[in-house]
């Protein structure tokens, strides 16, 4: 019996050892749980926009001082949907030509400020909205931010209007303007509903950016899905907080091009660096960026700090959105009525290269006899903000509103 007791004491740990083992197991399990939640975060289906999480606590005076106040455009409304709330703005003459505008990846629809007001001045009825996870639209935490989600969002916005936007008759339907990522989304919307979209205007559109412009590092980090989402989020937050500094480095190394200088290609991962900041990249290095560009630059940082859905939406957009290899959708644009699709590019744009698009896209959409390939606008990827008058002149020409306007174009 004594032998058995001694054996048991030898095999079984004492009280101190047992406590150490238990503590180690509990600590390890806790650390694993914490790290797992950081590396593989579980997000709610709806990520609240700043209107409910931040803006509601501000006084009217404080709200008026925001970079993007809730009443930035006239006709603001919030549209409830199964995906969350969508902020949109509708203004201009009720009987005017209806124009839906879709903005790019980095900011709210404020990037299209000058274009929207210019259209209204010419008698158009405009409708803008903040893409999910930007501005005052909720973020979507449990779905990929691909063309299906964004086209569905646009349809929800159109359906929310008191006016009829989606008819297919000769005097019905709407005209569509897409900028950068918004151009890639607009191409899918027009390809799916060709008779509803009366004319399609693509401003430096994503969708057919050459895949080789995404370097190996960028592909692995942002698009492959191999890097844990939590780590990508940390890297993305860091990158989005530094657009001015990083773009200034690019300028000191010889890029990007000046406002009227023909664009050059950025190698590999530098191209994705520019794409990451998209609309704001050129504004950051401009010799004298305008008030809107400066405002947009600051607003990106504000979104990182105050919009729970912004960084997740940005990450998902880089991975899933229609930015490259959209050949199937773009081929459908060739079936549109001739000369109802317009392409406008910036001369110094290193992100969406008009020469690449001329080679890769023009054959897909039916050639120059089928589309309106406008003369390039001065400036880089931010040309709708930096050179709105020249951009609008191309639009008037496309619509046939000003036959003599070409003489007033800036020489390029």
Predicted regions and their residues:
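Conserved loop-alpha-helix segment in the C-terminal half of the alpha/beta-hydrolase fold
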Residues: 331-379, 390
């Amino acid at each position: 019996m004594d032998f058995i007791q001694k054996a048991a004491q030898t095999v079984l740990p004492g009280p101190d050892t047992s406590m150490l083992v238990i503590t180690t197991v509990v600590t390890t399990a806790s650390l694993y749980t914490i790290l797992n939640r950081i590396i593989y975060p579980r997000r709610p289906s709806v990520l609240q926009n700043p209107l409910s999480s931040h803006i509601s606590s501000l006084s009217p005076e404080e709200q008026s001082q925001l970079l993007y106040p809730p009443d930035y455009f006239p006709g603001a409304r919030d549209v409830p949907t199964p995906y969350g709330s969508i902020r949109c703005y509708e203004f201009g003459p009720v009987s005017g030509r209806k124009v839906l505008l879709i903005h790019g990846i980095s900011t709210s629809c404020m990037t299209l400020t000058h274009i929207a007001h210019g259209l209204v001045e010419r008698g158009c009825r405009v409708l803008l909205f903040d893409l999910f996870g930007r501005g005052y639209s909720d973020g979507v935490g449990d779905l990929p931010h691909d063309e299906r989600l964004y086209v569905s969002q646009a349809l929800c916005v159109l359906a929310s209007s008191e006016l009829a936007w989606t008819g297919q008759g000769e005097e019905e339907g709407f005209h569509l303007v897409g900028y950068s990522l918004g151009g890639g989304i607009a191409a899918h919307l027009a390809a799916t509903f060709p008779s509803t979209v009366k004319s399609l205007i693509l401003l430096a559109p994503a969708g057919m950016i050459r895949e080789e412009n995404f370097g190996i590092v960028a592909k692995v980090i942002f698009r492959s899905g191999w890097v844990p989402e939590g780590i990508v989020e940390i890297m993305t937050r860091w990158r989005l907080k530094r657009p001015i500094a990083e773009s200034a480095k690019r300028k000191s190394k010889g890029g990007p091009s000046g406002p009227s200088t023909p664009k050059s290609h950025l190698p590999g991962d530098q191209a994705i660096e520019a794409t990451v900041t998209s609309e704001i990249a050129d504004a950051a290095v401009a010799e004298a960026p305008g008030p809107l560009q400066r405002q947009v630059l600051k607003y990106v940082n504000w979104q990182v700090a105050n919009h729970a859905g912004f960084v997740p939406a940005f990450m998902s957009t880089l991975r899933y959105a229609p930015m490259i290899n959209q050949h199937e959708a773009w081929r459908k644009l060739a079936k549109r009525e001739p000369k109802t699709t317009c392409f406008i590019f910036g001369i110094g744009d290193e992100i969406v290269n008009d020469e690449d698009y001329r080679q890769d896209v023009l054959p897909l959409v039916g050639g120059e006899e089928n589309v309106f390939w406008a003369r390039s606008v001065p400036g880089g990827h931010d040309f709708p903000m930096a050179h709105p008058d020249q951009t609008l002149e191309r639009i008037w020409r496309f619509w046939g509103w000003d036959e003599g306007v070409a003489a007033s174009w800036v020489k390029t």
